Amino acid sequence: MPLFSLRPAATLWPPVLLGSQFVFNIGFYAVVPFLALFLRDDMLLSGGLIGLILGLRTFSQQGMFIIGGTLADRYGAKAIILAGCVVRVAGYLLLACATSLWPIILGACLTGVGGALFSPSIEALLARTGTHSQANGKRSRAEWFALFAVCGELGAVIGPVAGGLLSGIGFRHIALAGAGIFLLALLVLFFCLPADGHTTTTRRRVPWWTPLRQPRFVAFILAYSSWLLSYNQLYLALPVEIQRSGGREQDLAPLFMLA
């Protein structure tokens, strides 16, 4: 594949997906961990409102994955990935410019919706290319997903460091930097992802609630939901604890690296 072309790629290069996950997590973890501090210190919101906004942001992403996956099946993964990048850029720009409550809520929700669009689509592409790789006797699909997870965790480590370095000049600049990261990702993915039209196969579709009839799958959902419930407390609890213990805003970055 040429290093640069003005036309979208004809074939999918799997490392593009790994790099996307790495960059997406940098753009996410450079911004979102510092959102609670911005809402508390700059916008002077109460703890209840901060928790509500963070909860809406989380639901807008994790709670909407099924919609993002459905749209990817219908319109193609590439289109939905690019749309997700656009939506997240819009959310970050709104957070950077907002001066009142409702634009902040909208911006936070848009950042979540963006993730709900591109995350399932990228994983679907990885599953497809991993299956093809395994069928050709190359790297297995499980190995590709393991590398995908490693790249995501690396981004989750570097992101808070990047946000911490920018925290001295204010959250709005952090949000603008996050928007820039996703705008760059949008441009790169436009050229590096092959065209992917909507699904035209005649395979039988089943209702989305069908997997809920499987007890093991329901148990997995409940276990993962419990993990999300506990993990997302960090976005609110860590800033509060740092303030209580007399720490600085920059101290948040290494704590999220460890988390």
Which ranges hold each PLM region?
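Helix-breaking motifs and short loop linkers at transmembrane-helix boundaries and internal kinks
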Residues: 44, 76, 97-102
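C-terminal membrane-cytosol helix-exit motif in multi-pass small-molecule transporters
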Residues: 180-198
